């Protein structure tokens, strides 16, 4: 395995890179997106600045190496999410010089060693109940990162949705056969779709919000958040009739501040839109 030392890996889109500087070879397996690993940080990180991280520090007084345990899909900061991606390119016993290049061009540098893979189950070998637990974990990580790191939250929600969607139609799942019933899986899937809608609203991708909240039209009692986000997307798309109809799916919407404010905005914009249309028509035929 001498040839492996010096091997380089790079993900230009994410600004990630690593170069192998040492190897105590044990096996060629690499961590998966659901693995649990033990790794060491061998020296202080450079150019970390004030960026939060559970694993990397730039403290001169810290002692090294620092050993950590990490379950993939649980990182709650941008730096640590990237650290997960880097570790997924390691083999056990590998030491590598790693870097994360930020949008401003700063290069955060650090040295990692993958001590061992504690748990390395392949996703395709998981049962429906196990997939549910992984998706739930990813969803919870997404919720925890949404306010501070929305793009990473979006990634967590997408990963969770992709895991669950393989079991559609959910009503085929039973507790006896699959370890979990379809209703529980569908409820989690709808929660994730609602969370995706929040991310997409931030990015002004309103058509995608409509797509991910289609269930609002068919569910007997869709959540308040899902109704509001769908109505807000219709409002921004200037589909005011649909926005108003969506709001009316919410019982006693008049008593809810956000809904009441959105309804008023819809009414004003709808009126202005009709007045503008009338003015355009008059100009055309005057």
From Swiss-Prot:
Disulfide feature: none
What keywords appear on the UniProt entry? Answer: Cell membrane, Cytoplasm, Developmental protein, Membrane
Concerning Pfam families, the annotation shows:
Bdbt-like_TPR, FKBP_N_2
Is this entry keyworded Cell membrane?
yes
Question: Where is the protein localized?
Answer: Cytoplasm, Cytosol; Cell membrane
Give one GO term, molecular function aspect.
Answer: kinase activator activity
Which Gene3D superfamilies does this UniProt record tie to the protein?
2.40.30.320, Phosphotransferase system, lactose/cellobiose-type IIA subunit
Give the record's GO biological process terms: locomotor rhythm; regulation of establishment of planar polarity; regulation of intracellular protein transport; regulation of post-translational protein modification; regulation of protein catabolic process
Classify the main location: cytoplasm
Which InterPro entries does the entry mention? Answer: Bdbt-like_TPR, FKBP4/5/8-like, FKBP_N_2, TPR-like_helical_dom_sf
User: Can you quote a single GO CC term?
Assistant: plasma membrane
User: What is the reported phenotype of gene knockout?
Assistant: Lethal. RNAi-mediated knockdown in the wing disrupts cell polarity. RNAi-mediated knockdown in clock cells, results in behavioral arrhythmicity and long periods. RNAi-mediated knockdown in the eye disrupts oscillations in the subcellular localizations of per and dco, leading to constitutively nuclear per and constitutively cytosolic dco in photoreceptor cells.
The protein's topology relative to the membrane is: Peripheral membrane protein
Going by the entry's taxonomy, the superkingdom of the source organism is recorded as Eukaryota
Q: Tell me how this protein assembles.
A: Interacts with dco (via nuclear localization signal). Interacts with Ankrd49; interaction promotes the stability of both complex members.
> What exactly does this protein do?
Functions in planar polarity establishment and circadian rhythms by promoting the activity and localization of dco/dbt. Required for regulating the levels of dco/dbt and per in the nuclei of photoreceptor cells and thereby is involved in normal oscillations of the circadian clock proteins in the eye. In the dark, the cry circadian and rhodopsin visual pathways, activate the accumulation of the protein into Arr1- and Arr2-dependent cytosolic foci which are required for dco localization to photoreceptor nuclei.
Q: What is this protein called?
A: Protein Bride of doubletime
Supply the source organism for this entry. Answer: Drosophila melanogaster
Name of the encoding gene = Bdbt
